[in-house]
C-alpha cells in the first residue's frame, strides 16, 4: 500500500511540475522565429507612420493596453498629447528615436518577444495574436 501511495504522489508531483513549467514557460522558439520574420515589415510600416505623423496608422499599431510611461493615457489620448505638443518637439523626439533603430530586449517582458528603441525610449511587443505592437513608452 505504501508503494502505491508513493508512486501516486510521485506521479501527482510530476504532473503538477509539468503544468507549472508550461504555465511559466518563456517565449517559444517558434514564436521567436515568427516575430523575427514579421519584424522588418512592421518596422518599415511603423517608421513610415512616425515620419508622416500618421495618427490613424499608428493607432492601429498600438494595443488597447498601451503604456504611456505612467500618465494613464490611452493610445489615442497619448497621440493627441504628442500632436498638441508638437511645437515643443514631441514628434521630432519620437522621429529621432525611431531613426536610431531598435534592439531585442528581454528586460520588459518574458511573455513575448520585445524590442526597444536604441535610446531606450519606446518598446514593441509581439503578442499572442502574432502581431507586433507599439506597446508603450519606457517608464523611468
Description of each model-found segment:
Residues 2-12:
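Bacterial N-terminal signal peptides that target proteins for export
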Residues 12-18:
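Hydrophobic helical h-region of N-terminal Sec-dependent signal peptides
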Residues 20-22:
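N-terminal signal peptide c-region/cleavage motif recognized by signal peptidases
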Residues 28-48, 59-140:
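C-terminal-biased regions
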Residues 51-52:
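Charged, alpha-helical scaffolding/interaction elements associated with membrane systems
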Amino acid at each position: 500500500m505504501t508503494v502505491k501511495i508513493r508512486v501516486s504522489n510521485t506521479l501527482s508531483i510530476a504532473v503538477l511540475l509539468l503544468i507549472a513549467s508550461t504555465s511559466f514557460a518563456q517565449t517559444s522558439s517558434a514564436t521567436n522565429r515568427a516575430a523575427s520574420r514579421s519584424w522588418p515589415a512592421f518596422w518599415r510600416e511603423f517608421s513610415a507612420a512616425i515620419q508622416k505623423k500618421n495618427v490613424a496608422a499608428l493607432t492601429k499599431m498600438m494595443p488597447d493596453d498601451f503604456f504611456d510611461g505612467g500618465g494613464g493615457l490611452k493610445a489615442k489620448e497619448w497621440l493627441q498629447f504628442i500632436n498638441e505638443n508638437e511645437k515643443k518637439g514631441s514628434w521630432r523626439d519620437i522621429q529621432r528615436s525611431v531613426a536610431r533603430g531598435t534592439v531585442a530586449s528581454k528586460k520588459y517582458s518574458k511573455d513575448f518577444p520585445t524590442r526597444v528603441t536604441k535610446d531606450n525610449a519606446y518598446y514593441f511587443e509581439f503578442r499572442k495574436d502574432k502581431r507586433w505592437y507599439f506597446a508603450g513608452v519606457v517608464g523611468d
